Amino acid sequence: MATTKSFLILFFMILATTSSTCAKLEEMVTVLSIDGGGIKGIIPAIILEFLEGQLQEVDNNKDARLADYFDVIGGTSTGGLLTAMITTPNENNRPFAAAKDIVPFYFEHGPHIFNYSGSIFGPRYDGKYLLQVLQEKLGETRVHQALTEVAISSFDIKTNKPVIFTKSNLAKSPELDAKMYDICYSIAAAPIYFPPHHFVTHTSNGATYEFNLVDGGVATVGDPALLSLSVATRLAQEDPAFSSIKSLDYKQMLLLSLGTGTNSEFDKTYTAEEAAKWGPLRWMLAIQQLTNAASSYMTDYYISTVFQARHSQNNYLRVQENALTGTTTEMDDASEANMELLVQVGETLLKKPVSKDSPETYEEALKRFAKLLSNRKKLRANKASY
């Protein structure tokens, strides 16, 4: 329902927009969105590694990083963790993790994060190791220090409202300048898997704010692309760097959306005869699976429709594997064998066609995106030098 409402708002805003010429390349807003999915985050990590490698090759710069090219990077659950890894600064004010470091991170820490430590009456994992690793990696870094705009969603179970962490929100809501490790644990706290996370923030005027957060997938249902576009739209309206963008027009947006894979349009299918025998617990598990899959599919459909309506379909690329099988469909199977399979899935996905109607592979499409991102960055730099 929330996703449908968001789409309708965006759709009617676009219909109300008068036809305009395509934005200058240097003034296009570039957006990267990364889905949630637990250990399946290995799949988009492979895609990010390929893209960053292409950017380094095109610009002949081995130190090029994704945060140098995207105006907004958003994610939820494991996608939010990837967002933090590639936007959180190190002591040299550069991303503390290159894209090639993400898969090794999963291999090193995944088995400890997803090591059963709960009980039949509580979450499957106690989350202690996850929180410890996040504290070690992200330190005391806060939202305002992110190297580009971020859009990370969580959900507060005490206020029953989504909580969106972005740099641009901080002027009006300084309490949202939380530590990145608190945010990353919160967005990983998927119901059933990890316990909710409680923390407080303090503003400069001495006010204290309390948060009781769970996985952002509760708010964005796994696919944060609409949220990321919303943040990008606000950025375009407020930042003088995008002066030619007078209203919402997807000709002026460049969106890369990365999924964590499904085994069809829906993660699992059931018959009415099967479902008729389910009790409340079984229904709870099935509803979570079906809602996530259906919402991800519909979000992609909505966004594709809007970009096509503005004759800007080449400005949107959704990278998603729809043929996962066996253990690769599980968000918490961090066995080495399964993680190796997920790496293979990501590498194979690069060779697959973007759609049934197009011979272009994901690898070719990402190379095209890399050239656009590189050219835009150079034009932006040249404009700033005058």
UniProtKB/Swiss-Prot annotation:
Gene3D superfamilies per the UniProt record, alphabetical: Cytosolic phospholipase A2 catalytic domain
Translocase is among the record's keywords: no
PROSITE patterns linked to this entry: PNPLA
Family annotation (InterPro entries): Acyl_Trfase/lysoPLipase (IPR016035), PNPLA_dom (IPR002641)
Subcellular location: Vacuole
One GO molecular-function entry: monoacylglycerol lipase activity
Sequence motif GXGXXG, residues: 36-41
Predominant cellular place of this UniProt entry's protein: other
EC number(s) per entry: 3.1.1.-
Domain PNPLA: 32-229
Active-site residues, as the UniProt record annotates them: S77 (nucleophile), D215 (proton acceptor)
GO biological process: defense response; lipid catabolic process
Chain positions carrying an annotated carbohydrate: N115
GO cellular component, one term: vacuole
Motif GXSXG, chain ranges: 75-79
Tree of life domain: Eukaryota
Signal peptide positions (record): 1-23
Pfam families linked: Patatin
Motif DGA/G: positions: 215-217
Function: Probable lipolytic acyl hydrolase (LAH), an activity which is thought to be involved in the response of tubers to pathogens.
PANTHER family, alphabetized: PATATIN GROUP D-2, XYLOSE ISOMERASE
Similarity section: Belongs to the patatin family.
Miscellaneous comment in the UniProt entry for this protein: Patatin have a dual role as a somatic storage protein and as an enzyme involved in host resistance. This tuber protein represents approximately 40% of the total protein in mature tubers.
Entry text on domains: The nitrogen atoms of the two glycine residues in the GGXR motif define the oxyanion hole, and stabilize the oxyanion that forms during the nucleophilic attack by the catalytic serine during substrate cleavage.
Protein name stated in the entry: Patatin-B1
